[in-house]
């Protein structure tokens, strides 16, 4: 690195003529695509994809699923579902975005009838971005709270009530009264200075200090969704800080976020390794790992359909397919990038990270069970309960607890941030494709404006009822909508556009392959993956249960609102299909057929990559084509 030179990230202002390239932060001098820009290095792309795929679910959901579904035996259906559902869809989306150099909405020039699928993906990313940054705000709050000599949730402090206890609480017992015995409640026994007879005590479970801290201090949780309460000001400030970090990382688009992910994507692995080494040295660690993936593995669980459904669902959501982000990030690749090897690398990294994280989590939970005299099954949790109750409780009981807490919550922060970067990049990429000239001039204000709007929408999630809203959005928007989009995506591209034609498109990028190479991909794309996704969707609908949080059921209007959110996301699929059909020419059948053909400006973005197959395609970057053009019998390539 040259000395005394401004880094590219903060490029020095010089008196020079402003060019289109200098106006567009996405574009560098050496980029192949001077309109949209490319990743500066392939490692920028790979780390961004790893950061997007590897998120909070790898740490707080996968280990719990493995434990509850047979331990090590769960890895068998997990690996099978990766091969049958996760990897095929992941490879398809990466190839799609890279081939056309377009984001999740404009890429549907491939099949204009299905443009609404892309809109659905972007809307789901918007909803998820709202609540995902709230989780990052929780992590920031706990990170700041950890900078104390004693962790605030280490003991039952002034905020706790009489239920706060690490040991079971005595509710009553038998006492000697005269010549006989009577069962009395413990408050009466204590008031009268009596002593319980040995073995007669009746216990009820207490609430851990970390649990009450989470409910009473962090969330100031209300009694239900009906009681919104006030905005929790310190969570609102943490949410603002989270959005400022996201905005700062994305102000130059992929050129800046591609550098930030070198830290946010790699640092979690350092922390997981440190936590694993520390956990492995603690008493009881081997017991925790045994429950996770060792001698306690139960292979008879493989006979249960629920285990296979959990494996497929975890793979599907963990890889972030059908959110639009994979298409958006891949659209900035150079045309001849080997997206096949990239898909393999990212998918395997994601799955191995999940397994690795489980060892770090369960080694320390095993120690927590050991010192509290409980079984591992009594301390293991999932989701928020693992991240903000069980694991903080375990860390509070370690020597130098604040240090380990700082490491853990900083890891959660970085895990969440790089996933959030990709979600926002999905939104800005959509604007980039629809309004390229405006984005060249106003990328920074548009990006910051997007962050500001999402921050304001997220304030509802940091009220005293905020956690209920977070769960509601997650339960509805991050579920069925994604499954529906994924099924239509693979059906539209493989069954309508044509799987063999799509394979020819891929070979234009990565080179021709022998027929046996595509045998597996054809089997998955044409048959196996759509069937699996459909089965998961049907299963999820059949097994639908009224959402609740902490055993508090959601009100009728809350459930109805959840359905309205998911309908709002997917309604654009039929709406855009109808619009395209109305705009087309001919009778109804001719209109539908014409809308199922690729648009005249579908194909490789740059002319030098089009070859004979796409030599007559219209120019994709023309301003008049910033939306998918109407398909009609009279449409001719320009």
Curated annotation (Swiss-Prot):
It is a multi-pass membrane protein. Keywords: Amino-acid transport, Cell membrane, Glycoprotein, Membrane, Symport, Transmembrane, Transmembrane helix, Transport. Glycans are attached at residues 155, 163, 174, 185, 193, 198, 298. One of its GO terms (biological process) is beta-alanine transport. InterPro entries: Na/ntran_symport, SNS_sf. Residues 131-230 are extracellular. GO terms for cellular component: apical plasma membrane; brush border membrane; plasma membrane. The chain crosses the membrane at residues 45-65, 72-92, 110-130, 231-251, 257-277, 311-331, 344-364, 395-415, 453-473, 476-496, 524-544, 559-579. SUPFAM superfamilies: SNF-like. Expressed in the distal region of the intestinal tract: cecum and colon. The keyword Transmembrane helix applies. Residues 1-44, 580-638 are cytoplasmic. Its main location: membrane. It is found in: Membrane; Apical cell membrane. This is Sodium- and chloride-dependent neutral and basic amino acid transporter B(0+). It comes from Mus musculus (Mouse). The lineage of its organism: Eukaryota, Metazoa, Chordata, Craniata, Vertebrata.
């Amino acid at each position: 690195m040259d000395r005394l030179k401004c880094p590219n990230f903060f490029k020095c202002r010089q008196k020079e003529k402003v060019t289109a390239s200098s106006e567009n932060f996405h574009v560098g001098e050496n980029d192949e695509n001077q309109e949209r820009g490319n990743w500066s290095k392939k490692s920028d792309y790979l780390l961004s994809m790893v950061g997007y795929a590897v998120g909070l679910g790898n740490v707080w959901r996968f280990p719990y699923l493995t434990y509850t579904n047979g331990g090590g035996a769960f890895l068998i259906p997990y690996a099978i579902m990766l091969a049958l559902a996760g990897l095929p869809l992941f490879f398809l989306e990466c190839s799609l975005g890279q081939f056309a150099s377009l984001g999740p909405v404009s890429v549907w020039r491939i099949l204009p009838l299905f443009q609404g699928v892309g809109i659905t993906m972007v809307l789901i990313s918007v909803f998820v971005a709202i609540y995902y940054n709230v989780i990052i705000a929780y992590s920031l709050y706990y990170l700041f709270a950890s900078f104390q000599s004693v962790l605030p949730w280490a003991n039952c402090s002034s905020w706790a009530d009489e239920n706060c206890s690490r040991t079971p609480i005595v509710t009553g017992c038998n006492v000697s009264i005269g010549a006989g015995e009577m069962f009395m409640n413990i408050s009466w026994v204590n008031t009268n200075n009596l002593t319980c007879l040995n073995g007669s005590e009746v216990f009820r479970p207490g609430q851990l200090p970390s649990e009450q801290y989470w409910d009473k201090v962090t969330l100031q949780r209300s009694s239900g969704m009906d009681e919104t309460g006030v905005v929790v000001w310190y969570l609102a400030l943490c949410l603002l800080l989270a959005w400022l970090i996201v905005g700062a990382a994305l102000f130059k688009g992929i050129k800046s976020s591609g550098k930030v992910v070198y830290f946010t994507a790699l640092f979690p692995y350092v922390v997981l390794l440190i936590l694993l080494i520390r956990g492995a040295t603690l008493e009881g660690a081997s017991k925790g790992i045994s429950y996770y993936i060792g001698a306690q593995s139960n292979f008879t669980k493989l006979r249960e359909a629920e285990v296979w459904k959990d494996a497929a669902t975890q793979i599907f959501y963990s890889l972030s397919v059908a959110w639009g982000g994979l298409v958006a990030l891949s659209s900035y690749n150079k045309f001849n990038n080997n997206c096949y090897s990239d898909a393999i690398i990212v998918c395997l990294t994601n799955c191995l990270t999940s397994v690795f994280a489980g060892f770090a989590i369960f080694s320390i939970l095993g120690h927590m069970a050991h010192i509290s005299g409980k079984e591992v099954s009594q301390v293991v949790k999932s989701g928020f309960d693992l991240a903000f109750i069980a694991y903080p409780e375990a860390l509070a009981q370690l020597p130098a607890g604040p240090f380990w807490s700082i490491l853990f919550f900083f890891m959660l922060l970085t895990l969440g941030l790089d996933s959030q970067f990709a979600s926002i990049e999905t939104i800005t990429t959509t604007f980039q494709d629809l309004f390229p000239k405006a984005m060249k001039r106003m990328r920074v204000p548009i990006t910051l404006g997007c962050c500001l709007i999402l921050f304001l929408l997220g304030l509802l999630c940091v009220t005293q009822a905020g956690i209920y809203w977070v769960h509601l959005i997650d339960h509805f928007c991050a579920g069925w909508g994604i499954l529906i989009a994924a099924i239509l995506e693979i059906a539209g591209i493989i069954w309508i556009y044509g799987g063999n034609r799509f394979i020819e498109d891929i070979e234009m990028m990565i080179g021709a392959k022998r027929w046996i190479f595509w045998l597996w991909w054809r089997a998955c794309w044409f048959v196996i993956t759509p069937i699996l996704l459909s089965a998961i969707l049907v299963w999820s609908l059949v097994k639908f249960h009224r959402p609740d949080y902490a055993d508090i059921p959601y009100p009728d209007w809350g459930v109805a609102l959840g359905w309205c959110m998911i309908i709002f996301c997917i309604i654009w699929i039929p709406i855009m299909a109808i619009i395209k059909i109305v705009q087309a020419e001919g009778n109804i059948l001719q209109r539908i057929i014409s809308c199922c053909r690729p648009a005249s400006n579908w194909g490789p973005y740059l002319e030098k990559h089009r070859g004979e197959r796409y030599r007559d395609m219209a120019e994709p970057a023309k301003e008049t084509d910033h939306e998918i053009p109407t398909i009609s019998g009279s449409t001719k390539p320009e």
